[in-house]
C-alpha cells in the first residue's frame, strides 16, 4: 500500500474517532438525557386519593376514625410468602397474580407488617367497623368518589383528586436500587371537611338502642330549639366498605328509611288535634261505639272496641278513629289539610345540594272533597304518605311551642388542620304554625298517651 493511501486511511480513522469523542461529550453534558434515564429507573406509586372527613357538631370525626395499611412490595423480596397471611382474599389473589412481576406495587394488609422487614404506610380507613349514620353519610365508588348519601351530594367539596405518591429508584428488574430509599411525596393541598349537625355520642347511643329494639326501622333525634338533627339511624345497616354484599341483601339496607315515605297511621292524629285547638274545637266530645259509619262504609277503631264517651284527651290516648273522623267533619277538609301542609307534610326536605328526602303524598283538596277519602285522611290513612323526617318535624313543632324549625343535617365546611369554619352549607328556617298555648295543650295530651294510653311502651 502506498504511503498516500496509508495516510488517508489514518486520517479517516482519526476523524471518526474524533466524531465519537465529540458525540460522547455532547451526550454527557446534555441533562435532558440524564433526566430521561433517571425517569426510566424510577417507579411512582400513587396512594389513595385524599378526601375530606365528616365531623359531628362538636368537631369529632365521623369518618376516618381508624387507619389501614399498605405494604410496599418489590420483586425478589419474597412478598408472596411473607405477606400472604396478612392479606384478605382480594389481596391474596393479587399476590398470586403479581408473584412474577417486574415492578413494585402496594398491597392492602390487615396490620402494620414493618416488623417483617417490609416497608408499610398508614392510610386513613374511611369507615369504621361499626360505622356511624351509614345511610345518611353514604359510600364511595371504586375511584374514591361519593356514590350515595352525603358522600355523593358533597363530593365536590370532599374530593380533591390530590394523592400522596411514593417515588422508588428501581433496577431493570423492578427491585429497589441499593443504597436508596422510597421517598413519600405529600400532596400539595389538604381537602376540606364537612361538619354535620349530628352528635357522635347521641348517634352512637341511638344506634345501640335501635340494634337492641328493632330489625327494621329508623330513629331521628332533633334539637327542639334549632331543628338540628342530632341522630339519624336506619336499620338494617350495611358495610360501607363492602357495599356489594348489601345490594341484594334482605331488608334493603341501602335505603335510608328516615327519608322514605310510608303510610302514616295514627301518628297523624296530633295534626287534627292542633287544628281543633286552633279552631276552638278542643272541647268536642263523642260517644264511640267502636266504629263510624259513612255512606255504607264502616271505619272501625282498633279491635272494634267501643271507647264510650271520649273527648280529645281520651281519643288520643285510646287512638279512637271514629272520634277523629267526626272531628275532621266538624273542622272541614280545608282546615285540616292546611294544618298538615304547614307542618311539612307533602313537601320534600333538602338535606344537602343534590340530596333530598321523599315528599310523601298530601292528598289534593279535590281528593278530600270525597267523604270517604277525607274520613281515611283524618286518622292517617288513604292516600296520605309521609317520611319519618316529616313526622319528626311535626312532633318537634309541638315540643318547640308551635314553631316549625326546618330539620338540618349539614352545617359548614371546615379546615381539617385547624377546625376553622369556612363556608356555611345550610341556613336555618323557622315559622310559627300554631299558638304557644296550643302547643302546651298538645304536649299535655301526648304525655297522657304515653302515661295512660297506647304509647305506654314509649314511657321512660
Give residue spans per PLM region.
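Periplasmic/cell-envelope proteins involved in peptidoglycan metabolism and beta-lactam response
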Residues: 1-244, 337-342, 458-459
Amino acid at each position: 500500500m502506498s504511503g498516500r493511501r496509508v495516510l488517508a486511511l489514518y486520517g479517516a480513522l482519526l476523524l471518526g474517532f474524533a466524531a465519537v469523542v465529540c458525540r460522547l461529550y455532547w451526550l454527557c453534558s446534555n441533562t435532558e438525557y440524564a433526566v430521561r434515564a433517571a425517569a426510566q429507573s424510577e417507579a411512582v406509586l400513587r396512594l389513595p386519593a385524599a378526601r375530606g372527613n365528616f365531623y359531628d357538631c362538636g368537631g369529632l370525626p365521623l369518618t376516618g376514625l381508624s387507619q389501614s395499611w399498605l405494604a410496599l412490595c418489590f420483586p425478589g423480596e419474597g412478598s408472596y410468602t411473607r405477606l400472604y397471611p396478612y392479606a384478605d382474599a382480594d389481596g391474596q389473589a393479587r399476590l398470586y397474580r403479581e408473584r412474577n412481576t417486574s415492578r413494585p406495587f402496594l398491597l392492602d394488609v390487615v396490620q402494620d407488617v414493618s416488623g417483617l422487614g417490609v416497608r408499610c404506610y398508614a392510610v386513613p380507613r374511611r369507615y369504621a367497623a361499626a360505622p356511624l349514620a351509614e345511610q345518611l353519610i353514604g359510600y364511595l365508588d371504586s375511584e374514591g368518589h361519593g356514590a350515595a348519601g352525603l358522600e355523593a351530594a358533597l363530593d365536590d367539596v370532599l374530593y380533591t383528586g390530590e394523592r400522596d405518591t411514593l417515588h422508588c429508584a428501581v433496577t431493570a428488574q423492578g427491585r429497589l436500587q441499593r443504597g436508596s430509599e422510597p421517598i413519600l411525596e405529600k400532596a400539595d393541598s389538604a381537602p376540606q371537611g364537612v361538619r354535620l349537625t349530628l352528635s357522635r355520642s347521641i348517634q352512637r347511643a341511638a344506634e345501640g338502642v335501635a340494634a337492641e329494639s328493632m330489625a327494621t326501622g329508623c330513629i331521628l333525634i332533633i334539637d327542639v330549639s334549632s331543628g338540628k338533627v342530632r341522630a339519624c339511624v336506619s336499620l338494617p345497616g350495611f358495610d360501607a366498605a363492602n357495599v356489594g354484599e348489601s345490594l341484594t341483601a334482605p331488608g334493603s339496607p341501602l335505603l335510608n328509611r328516615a327519608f322514605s315515605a310510608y303510610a302514616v297511621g295514627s301518628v297523624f292524629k296530633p295534626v287534627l288535634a292542633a287544628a281543633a285547638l286552633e279552631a276552638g274545637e278542643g272541647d268536642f266530645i263523642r260517644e264511640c261505639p267502636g266504629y263510624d259509619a259513612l255512606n255504607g262504609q264502616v271505619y272501625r277503631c282498633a279491635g272494634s272496641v267501643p271507647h264510650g264517651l271520649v273527648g280529645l284527651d281520651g281519643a288520643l290516648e285510646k287512638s279512637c278513629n271514629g272520634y277523629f273522623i267526626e272531628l275532621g267533619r266538624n273542622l272541614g277538609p280545608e282546615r285540616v289539610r292546611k294544618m298538615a301542609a304547614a307542618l311539612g307534610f307533602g313537601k320534600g326536605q333538602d338535606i344537602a345540594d343534590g340530596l333530598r328526602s321523599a315528599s310523601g303524598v298530601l292528598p289534593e283538596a279535590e281528593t278530600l272533597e270525597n267523604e270517604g277519602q277525607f274520613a281515611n285522611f283524618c286518622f292517617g290513612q288513604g292516600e296520605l304518605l309521609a317520611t319519618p323526617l316529616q313526622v319528626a318535624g311535626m312532633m318537634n313543632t309541638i315540643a318547640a311551642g308551635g314553631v316549625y324549625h326546618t330539620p338540618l343535617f349539614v352545617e359548614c365546611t371546615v379546615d381539617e388542620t385547624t377546625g376553622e369554619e369556612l363556608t356555611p352549607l345550610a341556613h336555618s328556617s323557622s315559622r310559627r304554625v300554631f299558638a304557644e298555648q296550643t302547643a302546651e295543650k298538645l304536649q299535655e295530651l301526648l304525655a297522657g298517651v304515653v302515661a295512660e294510653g297506647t304509647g305506654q311502651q314509649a314511657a321512660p
